[in-house]
Amino acid sequence: MTPAFSYPEPQPEWPSWYSEYRYGAFYLFPPPDVMHRVNALRSHYDPTSAAICEAHVSLTVPLPRPLDVATLAHVTECLAAQPAFSLEWGPPRVYPGVPGVVLDIAPMERVSALVAALEGCPCFRGAAPRRYAFSPHMTIAEFVSEARTQEILAEVRELGLHGAWWCSEVVYAIPDAAFRFHERWRGRLGSQQGEG
């Protein structure tokens, strides 16, 4: 099968976890106003993460192989069968078990159903299992110490970081040779009464 996209060759300086993401994964990207606001926080508090990817909600484990036209068509059908929904973001909290500050994402049930549908597609056959239970979030800072985590949380807690957006699209993003993720494709969720 011919890949639907071009993919980077693993670079000698890449740590092993970079190579796991060579074929990308699926994400939710916030609308421009939320993206701008969260990107500014990421750049300030965790420039390492900010350099890798813009603000996002990680959905799936990394793809184990390139996407081809046939499997991309299957993903398109899968997404069309999932209803669009109102996604709530914020407030900030500490990510459980590891240092870092994230924005909560809800409703858990709707996002989890979307993940289960995506990871049930043929393109995920043979994918490495998820290391931790799925917990939807949008990261502000992750490559920080425990002490810095508490400082960041105290600073951002009063910024009114919460809201909602109409979640109607899923993004497929792939890293480049410098391990900077770029959007390569968007798939639409099915319509739902009240959309607009």
Task: Write out the residue ranges for each language-model feature.
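Histidine-dependent nucleotide/RNA phosphoesterase domain, centered on the 2H-phosphoesterase fold
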Residues: 1-196
